[in-house]
Regions:
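Beta-strand-rich recognition/accessory modules
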Residues: 1, 38, 42-109, 113, ...
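Glycine- and small hydrophobic-enriched segments that form the cores of compact globular domains
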Residues: 1-58
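Short acidic, flexible loop segments centered on an aromatic residue
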Residues: 112-121
Length: 173
């Protein structure tokens, strides 16, 4: 002791003091750019952000057939899987455009098509048609000598369109 009466807590005392008031959000799927899902119409943003939901359909682990086309202006990668076509266009000027087509007739009324983008830095996303945007911080929780530390790693941005639209596009940058 000898330092003015302050007592350093024991490792057992620190361990007992480590408590979460709520569980951190669960990532049911890997974080990446353009993780595509069909979501229920009544899904609340809070449930989505916490990971406490089931997508109606997810292409996160789908095996896509890929076709690559190159021109003097851009490289286009067309991905097709299970009723979804996604085209990634990488232009020579460094811009990226992503376009989607899905089978709207096969989707129940009110369902939402969504794509999630996990970002470490802000990025401008322009959508056609205009998308509803949900965002929340991506954070990790780790135990340290101070207790539990929460570190923000980036931001999740989810772009949402009525599935009845049958398609959408995003310009990045």
């Amino acid at each position: 002791n000898g330092d003015g009466g302050e007592v350093t807590p024991s490792s057992q005392e620190i361990e007992q003091a480590v408590r979460l008031t709520q569980l951190p959000p669960l990532d049911a799927e890997d974080r990446a750019l353009f993780v595509d899902r069909m979501l229920p119409a009544d899904l609340a943003q809070e449930a989505y952000a916490s990971g406490a939901y089931q997508p109606l359909r997810s292409w996160a682990h789908a095996a896509f057939a890929a076709t690559v086309r190159s021109s003097s202006e851009a490289v286009e990668i067309t991905l097709v899987a299970d009723g979804l076509t996604k085209v990634l266009r990488f232009a020579n000027d460094g811009t990226l455009a992503v376009s989607y087509r899905w089978e709207a007739a096969a989707v129940p009324h009110g369902v939402v098509f969504a794509t999630e983008v996990s970002l470490s830095h802000p990025l401008e996303l322009r959508t056609t048609p205009s998308a509803e945007t949900w965002s929340f911080p991506i954070a990790t929780v780790a135990k340290s000598e101070r207790g539990l530390d929460q570190t923000v790693q980036g931001e999740s941005v989810t772009l949402r369109w009525p599935a009845a639209a049958g398609g959408a596009s995003i310009a990045v940058g």
